[in-house]
Amino acid sequence: MAFKIKRGDKVKVLAGKDRGKISTVEFLDSKSGKAIVKNINIAKKHVKAIEGRREGGIYEIELPMPISKVMLVCPKCEKPTRVGFRIEEKDGVVRKYRYCKKCNENIDLVYEKNKVKR
């Protein structure tokens, strides 16, 4: 399944305790459809010490959240937006772009390949 967000994208949280916050995507799990967003959805984990290996205590970890709960912030217009895909063909090269549906500007290049001549 192709996601409309990538690692490193700036996103806005739409639901949950961190609703309205803007941060960057650190990890995407395509199998479960979840993302880990920096400093969002933080939980405390109680960890027992293991002698010689790790120190015990209470650690804060970022939990994954469903991708449907975040929305990409367009780098051009700086607004949360839906994302579309656009395919352009020029000089025998096919390029696929992600684009902002609010300002209609290309966000980035998804892939580029030469068109096969038959």
Curated annotation (Swiss-Prot):
| Statement: the UniProt record of this protein carries the keyword Zinc | no
Q: Which Gene Ontology MF annotations are present? A: rRNA binding; structural constituent of ribosome
Sorted alphabetically, the Gene Ontology cellular component annotations on this record are:
ribonucleoprotein complex; ribosome
Which Pfam families does UniProt cross-reference here?
ribosomal_L24 (PF17136)
One GO term under biological process is: translation
Q: Which domain of life is it from?
A: Bacteria
Residue span of the signal peptide, if any? none
* Protein keywords: Ribonucleoprotein, Ribosomal protein, RNA-binding, rRNA-binding
Q: Which InterPro entries match?
A: Rib_uL2_dom2 (IPR014722), Ribosomal_uL24 (IPR003256), Ribosomal_uL24_KOW (IPR041988), Translation_prot_SH3-like_sf (IPR008991)
- Description of how the protein assembles with itself and partners: Part of the 50S ribosomal subunit.
Q: What does this protein do?
A: One of two assembly initiator proteins, it binds directly to the 5'-end of the 23S rRNA, where it nucleates assembly of the 50S subunit. One of the proteins that surrounds the polypeptide exit tunnel on the outside of the subunit.
Q: What does the similarity note say? A: Belongs to the universal ribosomal protein uL24 family.
Q: What is the protein named?
A: Large ribosomal subunit protein uL24
- Which species expresses this protein natively? Hydrogenobaculum sp. (strain Y04AAS1)
Gene, per the UniProt record:
rplX
